[in-house]
């Protein structure tokens, strides 16, 4: 049995889609003292992180756990009596996993011995590692490797440790390469003279039980680096357990494909003094089949072996953000700039700890997206981990408590016996070479001269526009809004046009590629509010020598954006510099596209051989005979070709393109390798619009605004995948193809997913030539086509919702006419191939049933849901109509992310129920309170939305009416954007935590997780099932939206058919399908659609666009403008009067769908719905599919693949609620108090494994007493210790939680009226404002209550706070981000980017240096004031007095003692719009209006200034 049992690709499953996350930890003695206790404590730490790891279908088989320690020299001398070991550090130990086959093992050992001797080293002997197979899980046992250790003696010529380590590395790399050639499985967990790794497919508590070595008292080390893994799959893979050879990694490398490609390109240019002739023996440097963590480890190890210090290597691979950081020293800035000219960052959420055995370091990614806390003790120990409380320590012995900050490093030097600070280590490394001098002297400046610009005068402009697919819609609905609005324009209602491969029309190649996005396993990042971590810097020219620092390396051109104006482009192509020659290649073809590509390759290679370093690919010389090669194909093909030839780093690829005009085009070109792009035809189009008077702006301003908008759009596209820098995005191929053949992908887009195959090179050529021919033949038409991508037009692109389908559906449901409904479904199903499901036909040979034998419509309809559409996006009338209808049917409506009015939780007098059965929890957490959560049958975590995955929801300010703001806890008239990520979900184990939180908040509700279809969503779904979700929703890219960038609507995500089938198949392969209910949504329109979804694996079904159409929507696609003419998607009281919908219409629609489903079931012979699920054997490709000129090339077999196993939900998840502290301890002690309202006061010990303390108790209060809760301080809970994550989440009024000690992330998440007090433990006597006492993302989405924190907090404190009043003694970066209410008093330092996106509430920050504080703030939305209002001063003083009373804060006490002076040191931070609204409201109230009327008048005044809204004594009624 082999130790690696990752299944081969089958159906839609691909092994390369696997992701992982984890908990990491380090326990070390700073002076290097080696003890067995360190090993024991490391193992204990591992067990305390068990909840951050994962288990699959076999609960006794972990996803992987292990530890990395120093070589235990005394232990090996005791155990290896028959091996003559040289002195310490003069021998290396290899930890090797072999197959259990003895003959295979002996063959491998023989080869390893030969390689050791060949390299001049000494084979000292082998040892079989004793293991206890009976102590591990069944699945782990079946795949358990045979573990052996090889001992290698150093030759006398290797004088130092690094030379010996390098030789061991060369031996291992050769052995690995030989193994690949021979097709033999073995794996070196480690091979070093300094460190050794013990790991496996184990749970944390199994590690020392399995490896008895670890129990021996002689097994000593000065440190233990530990890791507990959570994989998205359940397949046994021993080698993917951590630690790796140099590092443990918690996070994900989002740019991996690009990092691999660029390393591959560079390694053929490497020359190394350290390796000499051994360099070729170690290639390839990266094992591309490994996990992202192991590939990062490969890169880290190589640079260390090549002579870089570990800390230097970490700074190169994971640089802190420097381009926007004005606080950074010029030396450090120069270091980062120099290295950025040589290589791109390895970007993504990352906490790594690394070691070479002498130094141990840790570094956090630039965004601070992983937790990393540490204690330093008075007796010289450091405890570093993802969580505090993992090792017990006397508080009197703790010297200080801290956290690793974004981009910062912690370094422990065991030989020097001290911690080296981030500032010291980076300054030391940054000043080793004169980087600043080199940059000043060698960087090549390009200064565009406006006078020298080649003026673009195209006599054939219209022809060119037509040839490149320009339409009137492109210009009027995209190019002009881009510069007027300064961003990618918004659209709404989603995409209902066909995929490019299904379209009857010739399509741009760009349209076959879909942008990838982050969900669950890594977060999207916030490119708008957290812009300081992004960079658009671009380097041109040949790359320098990465291994040898030199001034020559920076002889390159630095650009601040990859979008080139004509002036910049002209300056580049005419530059005179010996190292920067340019050459233009015409990328055109006449008949043979393949020939055209080969000619381009030949010309490029020749140019590079002649010293050219700037290659310009131009289509400008197109004519009637010569067609442009699609620029995306030209760029990617050349990029891949040059990588294969080892030439890519010698040249930059610059594109002069007539086709590139949208954000998606630029993103795709950069993503596939373009260094810079000049969109000459877009500029010429602007010039035409200006010259002809249709655009009132100067040409220079238009070009500037366009370049800025496109650049920001590209950053937003990158950020959806969690990538911060254009440099990392370039060549990273963060796309998937839909409808491109495997041959084209392998040759020209290698590494890109294309799950269904598709069109070949000939068809790509035909599409380009068809457009080209039409452009040159179309002499009689002097105008562009109108265009119909976003809006239906007669004769244009097909749209599923068109006048015929809309009208027929509405009348059928209004009249309750099933025959008319059948006319609608005939039109929807049969007119065109609009969706992938239209490519299938049913097996006509099935034995039919009588209709009455089939499950009833009343039963089937209970599987139906309406989609997540928020109150705010929809009118009150539309939102409630959906809820009433679905509750009548026994189905479910979904609140969406805008909260819900509590009045709806009580049934109406007529028996109707307006309560949404599904309550959504999205990243904005609007209205998410304990009372909201307990009033649900299902709680849905929205990880992504089909129309805009990787982005937050948007509600424009003109739709945030007072009643909407009230439900959302925000400011009327101020636009709301949800953060792109859930700030408590940066990885799979974070999602598991939120699922656990919500299950605690409502034990009776199912927990649902909404994902968007993409390649790899199946593996993510498996991880979500392991994270104990009850329902998984796979949403299609074509889902509706109230407001989304057009780029996202068209170009992100996949059809649900692909994602659903992949999720179903992957869950079955993992043995997890029976644990979850699978649901799908995204333009489900008919009963046939439901049947197709069921056959592909769905059990439940969401409808959103169709029900809105039923209620009256006419697809005006103006939802975001608040101008909906039928009262569906507006808050405007006058327009809402036009609402004609009725819950009965929705009831009719749903029953019609169910009835049509029954007809199909009868025809196919299925008696019950469950029988039909996953039965893809009744489908085959339709005749229509076989006849279509493009769709006929698709391979649909992967969609229909059926693995063996259970196809439906069978067994509920085990949420382990019965093991929670609330159930075992708290609730029994306070149950009587909850029931009687009497006071209760209890004391409880707590540790980091006790998560979500207080939440279940709070939910019981909310169920009984509603939003009012209990009187203040009714239930007092006194905790002592280190609390686990989500301490006090969602606790309502009446509960007070005291914590003596410290806490992990998410304290007070969703606080709903309760009170939280955290103070330092008895005995810990360090200054509170110098010590970190709670973790990241505290009080996220909190709605009311109060809190007092006697110490510092981590990153993103009070994100989306909408009502809590809190005092804290210092916070990290991004504090008060997206805050909409409440007040935050900070008695200490704040981190960078304070108050970004803050639209409500007030912060009061104590500072000695106001200027320095202001430099840390995001100034976009806020004002600074001093504290002058006496009432306000008294409020702050009262908060400090309570803080002192609750926490004994010395800091607060000192401030109160000197209050007259102290108050002058506070800076008040208030959002501009919030202040304006408050002032307007007071003004209206002074004029005699009631509170309600004043708020409405203020809203009108601030959002609709043209209307006369002055209060003139006349009172207006407010419609609610």
Curated annotation (Swiss-Prot):
Induction: The gltAB operon is positively regulated by GltC and negatively regulated by TnrA under nitrogen-limited conditions. It catalyses: 2 L-glutamate + NADP(+) = L-glutamine + 2-oxoglutarate + NADPH + H(+). Its EC number is 1.4.1.13. [3Fe-4S] cluster binds at residues 1113, 1119, 1124. GO terms for biological process: ammonia assimilation cycle; glutamate biosynthetic process; L-glutamate biosynthetic process. Residues 22-415 form the Glutamine amidotransferase type-2 domain. The active site is at residue 22. CDD domains: gltB_C, GltS, GltS_FMN. FMN binds at residues 1060-1112. Belongs to the glutamate synthase family. Aggregate of 4 catalytic active heterodimers, consisting of a large and a small subunit. This is Glutamate synthase [NADPH] large chain. The lineage of its organism: Bacteria, Bacillati, Bacillota, Bacilli, Bacillales.
């Amino acid at each position: 049995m082999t130790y690696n049992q990752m299944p081969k690709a089958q159906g839609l499953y691909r092994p390369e889609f696997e992701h992982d996350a984890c908990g990491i930890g380090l326990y070390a003695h700073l002076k290097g003292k080696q003890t067995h206790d360190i090993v024991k404590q490391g193992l204990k730490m591992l067990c305390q992180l068990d909840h951050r790891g994962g288990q699959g279908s076999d609960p006794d088989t972990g996803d992987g756990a292990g530890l990395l320690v120093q070589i235990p020299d005394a232990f090996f001398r005791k155990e290896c009596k028959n091996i003559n070991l040289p002195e310490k550090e003069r021998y290396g130990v290899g930890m090797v996993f072999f197959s259990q086959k003895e003959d295979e093992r002996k063959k491998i050992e023989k080869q390893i011995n030969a390689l050791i001797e060949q390299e001049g080293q000494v084979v000292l002997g082998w040892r079989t590692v004793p293991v206890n197979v009976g102590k591990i899980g069944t699945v782990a046992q079946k795949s358990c490797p045979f573990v052996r250790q090889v001992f290698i003696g150093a030759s006398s010529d290797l004088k130092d440790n690094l030379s010996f380590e390098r030789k061991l590395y060369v031996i291992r790399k050769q052995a690995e390469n030989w193994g690949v050639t021979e097709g033999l499985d073995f794996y070196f967990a480690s091979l070093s003279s300094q460190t050794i790794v013990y790991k496996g497919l184990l749970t944390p508590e199994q590690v020392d039980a399995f490896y008895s070595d670890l129990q021996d008292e002689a097994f000593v080390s000065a440190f233990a680096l530990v890791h507990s893994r959570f994989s998205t799959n359940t397949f046994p893979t021993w080698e993917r357990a951590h630690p790796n050879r140099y590092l443990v990694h918690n996070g994900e490398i989002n740019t991996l494909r690009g990092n691999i490609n660029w390393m591959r390109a560079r390694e053929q240019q490497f020359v190394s003094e350290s390796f000499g002739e051994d360099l070729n023996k170690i290639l390839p440097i990266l094992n591309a089949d490994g996990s992202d963590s192991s590939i990062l480890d490969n890169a880290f190890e190589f640079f260390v072996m090549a002579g870089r210090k570990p800390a230097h290597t970490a700074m190169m691979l994971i640089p802190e953000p420097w381009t926007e950081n004005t606080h950074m020293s010029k030396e450090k800035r120069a270091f980062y700039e120099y290295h950025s000219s040589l290589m791109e960052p390895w970007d993504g959420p990352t906490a790594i700890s690394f070691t070479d055995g002498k130094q141990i370091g840790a570094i956090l990614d630039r965004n601070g997206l992983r937790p990393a806390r540490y204690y330093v003790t008075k007796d010289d120990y450091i405890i570093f981990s993802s969580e505090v409380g993992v090792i017990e320590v006397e508080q009197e012995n703790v010297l200080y408590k801290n956290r690793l900050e974004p981009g910062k490093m912690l370094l422990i030097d065991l030989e020097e016996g001290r911690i080296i600070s981030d500032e010291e280590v980076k300054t030391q490394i940054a000043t080793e070479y004169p980087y600043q001098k080199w940059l000043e002297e060698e960087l090549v400046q390009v200064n565009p001269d406006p006078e020298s610009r080649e003026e673009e005068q195209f006599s054939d402009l219209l022809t060119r526009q037509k040839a490149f697919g320009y339409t009137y819609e492109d210009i009027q609905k995209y190019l002009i809004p881009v510069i007027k609005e300064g961003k990618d324009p918004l659209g709404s209602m989603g995409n209902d046009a066909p995929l490019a491969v299904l379209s009857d029309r010739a399509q741009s190649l760009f349209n076959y590629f879909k942008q990838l996005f982050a969900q669950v396993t890594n977060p999207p990042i916030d490119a708008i509010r957290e812009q300081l971590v992004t960079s658009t810097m671009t380097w041109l020219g040949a790359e320098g020598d990465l291994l040898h620092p030199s001034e020559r390396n920076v002889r390159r051109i630095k650009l601040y954006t990859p979008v080139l104006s004509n002036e910049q482009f002209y300056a580049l192509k005419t530059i005179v510099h010996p190292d920067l020659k340019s050459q233009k290649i015409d990328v055109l073809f006449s008949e043979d596209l393949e020939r055209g590509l080969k000619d381009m390759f030949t010309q490029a290679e020749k140019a590079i051989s002649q010293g050219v370093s700037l290659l310009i690919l131009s289509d400008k010389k197109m004519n009637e005979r010569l067609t442009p090669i699609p620029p995306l194909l030209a760029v990617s093909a050349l990029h891949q070709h040059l990588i294969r030839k080892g030439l890519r780093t010698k040249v930059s690829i610059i594109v002069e393109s007539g086709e590139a005009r949208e954000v998606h085009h630029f993103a795709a070109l950069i993503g596939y390798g373009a260094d810079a792009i000049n969109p000459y035809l877009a500029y010429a189009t602007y010039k035409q619009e200006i010259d002809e008077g249709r655009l009132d702006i100067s040409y220079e301003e238009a070009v500037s605004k366009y370049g800025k908008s496109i650049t920001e759009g590209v950053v937003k596209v990158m950020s959806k995948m969690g990538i911060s820098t254009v440099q990392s995005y370039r060549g990273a191929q963060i796309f998937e193809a839909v409808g491109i053949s495997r041959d084209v992908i392998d040759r020209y887009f290698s590494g890109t997913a294309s799950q269904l195959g598709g069109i070949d090179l000939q068809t790509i050529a035909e599409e380009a030539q068809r457009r080209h021919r039409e452009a040159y033949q179309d002499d009689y038409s002097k105008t562009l086509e109108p265009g119909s991508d976003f809006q239906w037009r007669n004769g244009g692109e097909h749209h599923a919702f068109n006048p015929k389908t809309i009208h027929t559906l509405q009348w059928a449901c209004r009249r309750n006419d099933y025959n008319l409904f059948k006319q609608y479904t005939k039109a929807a199903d049969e007119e065109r191939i609009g969706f992938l499901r239209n490519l299938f036909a049913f097996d006509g040979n099935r034995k039919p049933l009588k209709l009455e034998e089939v499950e009833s419509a009343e039963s089937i309809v209970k599987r139906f849901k309406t989609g997540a559409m928020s109150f705010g996006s929809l009118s009150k009338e539309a939102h409630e109509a959906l809820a009433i209808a679905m509750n009548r049917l026994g189905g479910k409506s979904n609140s969406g992310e805008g909260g819900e009015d509590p009045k709806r939780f009580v049934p109406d007098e007529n028996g109707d129920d307006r309560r949404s059965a599904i309550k959504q929890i999205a990243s904005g957490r609007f209205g998410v309170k304990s009372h909201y959560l307990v009033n649900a049958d299902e709680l849905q975590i929205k990880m992504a939305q089909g129309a805009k995955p990787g982005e937050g929801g948007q509600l424009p300010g003109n739709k945030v009416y007072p009643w909407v703001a009230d439900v959302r806890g925000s400011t009327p008239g101020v636009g709301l954007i949800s953060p792109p990520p859930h700030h408590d979900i940066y990885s799979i184990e974070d999602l598991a935590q939120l699922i656990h939180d919500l299950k605690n908040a409502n034990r009776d509700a199912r927990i649902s997780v909404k994902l968007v279809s993409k390649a790899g969503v199946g593996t993510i779904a498996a991880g979500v099932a392991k994270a104990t979700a009850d329902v998984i929703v796979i949403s299609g890219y074509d889902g509706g939206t109230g407001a989304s960038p057009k780029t996202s609507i068209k170009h992100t995500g996949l059809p649900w058919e692909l994602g659903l089938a992949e999720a179903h198949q992957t869950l079955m392969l993992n043995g997890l399908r029976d644990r979850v209910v699978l649901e799908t949504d995204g333009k489900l329109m008919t009963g046939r659609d439901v049947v197709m979804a069921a056959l592909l694996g769905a059990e439940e079904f969401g409808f959103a666009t169709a029900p809105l159409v039923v209620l009256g929507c006419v697809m005006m696609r103006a939802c975001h403008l608040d101008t909906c003419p039928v009262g569906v998607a507006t808050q405007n009281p006058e327009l809402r009067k036009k609402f004609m919908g009725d819950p009965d219409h929705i009831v009719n629609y749903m029953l019609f769908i169910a009835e049509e489903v029954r007809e199909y079931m009868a025809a196919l012979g299925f008696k019950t719905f469950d029988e039909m699920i996953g039965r893809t054997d009744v489908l085959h490709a339709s005749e229509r599919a076989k006849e279509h000129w493009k769709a006929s090339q698709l391979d649909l077999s992967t969609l229909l693949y059926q693995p063996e196993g259970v196809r439906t939900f069978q067994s509920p998840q085990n949420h382990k609620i019965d093991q929670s502290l609330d159930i075992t301890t708290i609730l029994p002690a306070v149950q009587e108090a909850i029931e009687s309202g009497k006071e209760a006061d209890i004391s409880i010990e707590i540790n980091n494994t006790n998560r979500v303390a207080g939440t279940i108790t709070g939910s019981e209060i909310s169920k009984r007493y509603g939003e009012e809760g209990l009187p203040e301080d009714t239930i007092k809970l006194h905790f002592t210790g280190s609390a686990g994550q989500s301490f006090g989440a969602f606790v309502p009024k009446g509960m007070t939680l005291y914590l003596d000690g410290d806490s992990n992330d998410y304290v007070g998440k969703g606080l709903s009226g309760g009170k939280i007090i955290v103070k330092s433990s008895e005995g810990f006597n360090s200054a509170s404002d110098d010590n970190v006492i709670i973790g990241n993302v505290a009080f996220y989405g909190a709605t009311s209550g109060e809190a007092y924190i006697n110490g510092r907090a981590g990153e993103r404190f009070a994100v989306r706070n909408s009502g809590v009043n809190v005092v804290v003694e210092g916070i990290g970066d991004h504090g008060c981000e997206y805050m909409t209410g409440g007040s935050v008093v900070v008695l200490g330092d704040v981190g960078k980017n304070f108050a970004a996106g803050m639209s409500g509430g007030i912060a009061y920050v104590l500072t000695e240096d106001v200027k320095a504080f202001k430099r840390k703030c995001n100034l976009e939305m806020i004002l600074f004031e001093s504290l002058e209002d006496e009432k306000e001063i008294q409020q702050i003083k009262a908060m400090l007095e309570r803080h002192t009373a609750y926490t004994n804060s010395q800091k607060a006490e000192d401030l109160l003692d000197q209050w007259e002076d102290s108050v002058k040191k506070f800076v008040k931070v208030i959002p501009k719009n919030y202040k304006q609204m408050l002032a307007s409201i007071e003004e209206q109230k002074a004029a005699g209006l009631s509170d309600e009327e004043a708020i409405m008048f203020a809203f009108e005044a601030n959002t609709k200034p043209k209307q006369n809204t002055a209060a003139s004594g006349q009172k207006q009624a407010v419609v609610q």
